Amino acid sequence: MNPKPSGRAGDAEAGVRLAAPGDLDPAGAGMRLLEREEELQRIAAAIASARAGTGAVVALEGSAGIGKTRLLWAAMERAAESDVAVISARGGQMETEFAFGVARQLFEPVLAAAETGEREVLLEGAAAPAALLLGGGRADRLGEPVGGGDRSFATLHGLYGMTSKLAARAPLLIVVDDAHWADVPSLRFLGYLARRVHGLPMLLLVAVRPEDPGAHGLLLTELVAGPEVDVVRPGPFTLDAVRTLVQDAFAPASLDPRFVRGCWTTTGGNPFLLMQLIGALRVRGVQPTSDAVEQIGEVGLTTVSRWINLRLAALPPSATALAEAVAVLGDGADAVQAAGLAGLDADSCDVAVDGLVSMSILRGADGLAFVHPLVRSAIYAELAPRRRARAHREAARLLWHAGAAAEGVASHLLAAAPAGDGEVVEILLDAARSATRKGAPDLAVRYLRRALAEPAHDTSRPELLRELGTAEQNAGQFAAAAEDLRRALECTDDIAAKIEIAFRLRTALVWSDRAHEVAPALGGLIAEAAKRDSEGALLLEAAVAGALQVDLSTPRRLRGRVRQVVGPAFAGEPVPPHISSLAAVEALFANEPAARVLRLAEEAARGSYQAPEFARAPMRAQLFVALIFAEGHSLARRLLDDEVEDARQHGSAAQFLNAAVLRSMLFYRLGTLAEAEADARAALEAAHLHLGTGPSGAGPPAASLHAPMAVAVLLDTLIERGNIEDAERVLTESGLAHTDSPLLLFTFLIGARARLRAAQGRTPEAIDELLALGARIEGALLTPALVPWRSQAALALAGEDADEARRLACEELELARVFGAPRTLGVALHAAALTGPVNERVGLLREAVAVLEDSPARLEHARALVELGAALRRQGQRSEARTALERGMDGAWSCGATALAQRAREELRASGSRPRRLALSGVDALTGAERRVADLAAQGLTNRQIAQALVVSVPTVETHLRHVFRKLDITSRKQLAEHLGSEQPAEP
């Protein structure tokens, strides 16, 4: 390929025009809207919902030519009449390889039309991460993301922030036509947005073809199939509608019924085909009489391609050449480039354009565009495969010479055959890096795989494999990443580069449930690094040791390798932070005193940013685990808050997923159930959107380290709320009801699954799960801090095997006393009290209450108080029992633990007290936190403003509002004031 001319901006999109926003002028726009009353009513109702602040999502689903675009046009007209702002975009077959192409169509015109100051405001705050994609704002201040430059989650979060800002200015209609041709990152954004429209002055309106889902049908299916989506399916015209349109077109004195029926049966009532048939008949001078019925068949409009061929046959060959060029370049093609691709001079091009417009093949508008996507598809399909590939390579050459961005050129190179051109490799590599920076690793993977096929020169192959493996990892394709990173390692000579590749390989193997392969994969490199880079060798030893830690099936002889690596830290010697974090986890697993675990974790935290960037993610994950379970709550909360915010501002989905799921566990252990639920749901959504898992975590093992933990936290919060049926549904939908793995974070899922079975009365299943878990982790995980399987099993066994229950509870209590952390000890004391001798019960429960009194673990404190009150009541100490029960009920209610609060209320009634009824619906059912959020929302504050006022996260506010709406049985924020009135929140 010719080199790119100097003086051209590298990111200019000269000659590459995304379908113009708002340019949704449908073929037959002047046609009357017939038999669409119901569709228009549903769209009007959705617009009214947006104006009322309720929010709505509508999907127009139907075959090509059925009139979806015409309905979108009508919706935009109605919105404009209702003072609703409109932004629009259209997917295109040649635009599926543009990172966030549809999203950019939506927002770039808004920013282009804004004054400089207004543009800065639009791209501030939550929208700031979108600045790199959309331009303007403070993109230069965003910093670099962690781990390979992937900004996928940050970009998504920024686009949502931008959308929220626009909706805050005025009710907003977002229109996306041909969403089945939207690029994958934009589809992710639309799905992300659809789940958040509720309660916002916004309508998301998309048009899709169910039979043409593109290469990303799952994302599209989920966008349309969501519970919040109203799917509108316009049908074909009836015979009556066809009669009306034929009458309008021909205005005859009389209309022959057989002619009308012939038009109807030939087109199947498809509006687009019908209008094209009518146009073709009129060009021939046909009148709608019985004599003309046979001519309908002669026109032969049974397929679009046949109709196009008939029209092109009436034009000079130059018109066909130009039509084919536009089909290759895509809608919105520049006339000069289309002429170049067609081999036409300017005058011949003008003549060809005029002819194509006159035959209703091209639209008469800026840029060259077909009257309907069906037309482009038909012309493109007529090109023989080899000719098509050559045309795309020539299109790439023309665009590159014109200064187009690498991504625009790469979309054509993907459709061109490899030819051993080194310049092509450079363009594709440039495009991949651009896609990664914008948060579209999926596209980067496609570009890089194509670059490898060119084929690449030997000198560029290591770099391509390294970048491909990193992109695959960012896209959640961990198995593929592992294989490509292995290949990169084999053909790389530089030791520093090899160490970085090895770290990425380690992550890919662990995340694809193959942690046991890490040690053999990195063994040879460690020996090599020991001779050439001693610090690098230590990093690699820590990487292998960390993988051995998270795989609980690691043989005892290999676990000794971990002890060898962390030995200097245990001896008190100065060590790098990645060794301190590893040592903290090793001490935690071995049930060494929590104070020692925290000391090592705090040392790691102080130097956590001294490690190389590629080594930080596993090190910080170890740090967070040590802090959470050794109960260094304050530092854990601060660091995790920073990590979540960093991911939102300029991080990847993997970074957010890791931080959110660990913070959800922290929140659950603290008893802040709404926050725990919010983070767990956000983590599952991130796993689903970016890493290919199912709605609640099901799917390939892309998120095997984190989705099970998020499901575990979600199960636990629902159990505490008494929502057992919801918990079972979450578990079933996750696909993890029977899944097992030796990886560490699966132990949390097994524990939560057992708690659910016990709550359902399926005690034998709970016991089997817990005892099997205990047998598996024996020797690898001694501490009860992570998963207290012994106390859980003891409580389940108490009614069947009291001796075994007591043995397990005593064993856990002994371990917990050594560990010394309040929550861990309180949980063990609670189990020992309920399974031990009755005469020791009150004493053990008093100790549990005392241990937890000053701990931030509010839920466990409330649980201990309720059990103490119940035990005191049974001993006849009613006054003291009531005090404990009332405190326990208050604590449980403030946590949102409805089931425990209800239990406390029942015990109070049994003690002779008359506690206030715990309402399950209505204003009295709101917890204090829910009422505070509801009051601020009723005052008109946005979710972000509420979050700032209450110092909580936006997802937490969303979770509270979801509970408020359910309890009050409302659908709009505007209904809050009338339901809340002047009443005060009910506290038991």
Where are these regions (language model features)?
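Helix-turn-helix DNA-binding segment
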Residues: E867, E906-R909, P915-P988
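Extended alpha-helical scaffolding segments used for macromolecular assembly and cargo binding
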Residues: V57, L71-A75, A79, V351-A352, ...
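P-loop NTPase Walker A phosphate-binding motif
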Residues: I66-E97, G101-R104
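Internal alpha-solenoid helical repeat scaffolds
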Residues: A80-S82, R282, D347-S348, P441, ...
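Alpha-helical sensor/transducer elements of the RecA-like P-loop NTPase core
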Residues: K4, A154, H198-G262, T266, ...
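Short secondary-structure boundary elements
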Residues: D23, I66, A241-R446, R450, ...
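Conserved Walker-type P-loop NTP-binding/catalytic site
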Residues: P5, G15-D23, G101-L173, T221, ...
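Conserved adenine-nucleotide phosphate-binding loops and their immediately adjacent elements
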Residues: M1-A48, P129-V146, T244, L301-V304, ...
